[in-house]
UniProtKB/Swiss-Prot annotation:
Residues 10-127 form the Response regulatory domain. Residues 160-353 form the CheB-type methylesterase domain. Belongs to the CheB family. Phosphorylated by CheA. Phosphorylation of the N-terminal regulatory domain activates the methylesterase activity. The gene is cheB3. GO terms for molecular function: phosphorelay response regulator activity; protein-glutamate methylesterase activity; protein-glutamine glutaminase activity. Pfam families: CheB_methylest (PF01339), Response_reg (PF00072). This is Protein-glutamate methylesterase/protein-glutamine glutaminase 3.
Length: 359
């Protein structure tokens, strides 16, 4: 049931494939707390169905006849803001379009393969239902609210940054835009930033490329064994856990592995934060952003116990206040801040630590 109303979550399914509409309808209607109230084969029909049924969440395919899915999403968010779960193909083009949809206001996405869609969707039926529940309760991002990062900061001679620190970031639902806003506020010459965003394999490379075009720092998908360098933000690949490990000369390197999922995710945030606590202690800064579930909370607590400064995104600016809530609940978060102030405070922390080191 919808947490706010106690009634079933009302879903409208929009997809040009009759098979996908049928599969999603069956998956939704198998759950006692949700129901499909309408389906549509294209955005023109969907517009009328949404107006008639006032759904809690819409599933939306990107590639549809009569109107591009992104254009429909753009209009929907402007005229009748509604939580949207995107349906995306696992291709480079699909990942680029999905990231554009998240930027336009979609809450999350599920991916469908090119072959054997029926078996794949049945295997992930419970994950689809869980994403629908989270999407229905998500806080929609408002235009120009919590979205305007501070201007890119250049550190001058009077504001040195601590050089031996590393910054670690974890996020899930809503995280693609939150990470972008955070990195937009970090200076080009900042310390290495290691980031885990729950995302499939084909999407993380595209995500890193997209951020690299927008942010002051260089942003790239992480590679196993490479040095963690200042001025670079590293995105964990969608198929691997990412950890930090000591390297020669007092530096650090990135270690990737394909061990079992943690908290149902690979990459997961906890392995990254655990490695930061183990190898960096007080030389680490941890940041936990919007996302459902508990991944990262225990690792952030271990970072704090090891001496790291820890930050959590506040409830008001989160799309889904799950991971930061759990981290705050167990005492892992030292500083709670809105998204548009997190980068500023992390930079201030790095500057104050540098000043203390000098004196």
């Amino acid at each position: 049931m919808s947490a706010g109303t106690g009634r079933r979550i009302r879903v409208v399914v929009v997809d040009d494939s009759a098979l996908v509409r049928s599969l999603l309808t069956a998956i939704v209607n198998e759950a006692p707390d949700m129901e499909v109230v309408a389906t549509a084969s294209d955005p023109i029909i969907a517009r009328e169905k949404i107006r008639e049924t006032s759904p809690d969440v819409v599933t939306l395919d990107v590639e549809m006849p009569r109107m591009d899915g992104l254009e429909f999403l753009r209009r929907l968010m402007r005229l009748r803001p509604t939580p949207v779960l995107m349906i995306s193909s696992l291709t480079d083009a699909g990942s680029e379009t999905t990231l554009a949809a998240l930027e336009l206001g979609a809450v999350d996405f599920i991916h469908k393969p090119a072959d054997d869609i029926a078996r794949h969707m049945q295997e992930y039926a419970e994950e689809i239902r869980e994403k629908l529940r989270v999407t229905a309760e998500a806080r929609l991002r408002q235009p120009n609210r919590f979205r305007q990062p501070p201007p890119a900061r250049k550190t001058g001679p009077g504001a040195p940054l601590r050089k031996n620190a590393l910054v670690f970031v974890g996020a899930s639902t809503g995280g693609t835009e939150a990470i972008k806003d955070f990195l937009m506020g970090m200076p080009a010459d900042g310390p290495p930033i290691l980031i885990v965003q729950h995302m499939p394999e084909h999407f993380t490379f595209t995500f890193a490329e997209r951020l690299n075009k927008l942010c002051p720092m260089r942003v790239k998908e992480a590679e196993d064994g490479e040095a963690a360098l200042a001025g670079v933000a590293y995105i964990a690949p969608g198929h691997s856990h990412m950890r930090v490990a000591p390297a020669g000369g007092g530096g650090f390197r990135i270690a990737l592995d394909q061990e079992e999922p943690v908290n149902r995710h690979r990459p997961a945030v906890d392995p990254l934060f655990d490695s930061a606590a183990r190898h960096l202690g007080k030389n680490a800064i941890g940041v936990i952003l919007t996302g459902m579930g508990k991944d990262g909370a225990e690792g952030l607590l271990r970072m704090r116990h090891a001496g790291a400064v820890t930050f959590g995104q506040d409830e008001a600016s989160c799309v889904v206040y799950g991971m930061p809530r759990e981290a705050f609940r167990i005492g892992a978060v030292a500083h709670v801040l809105p998204l548009n102030r997190l980068a500023e405070k992390v930079v201030e922390c790095l500057q104050s630590q540098a000043e203390r080191a000098i004196t």
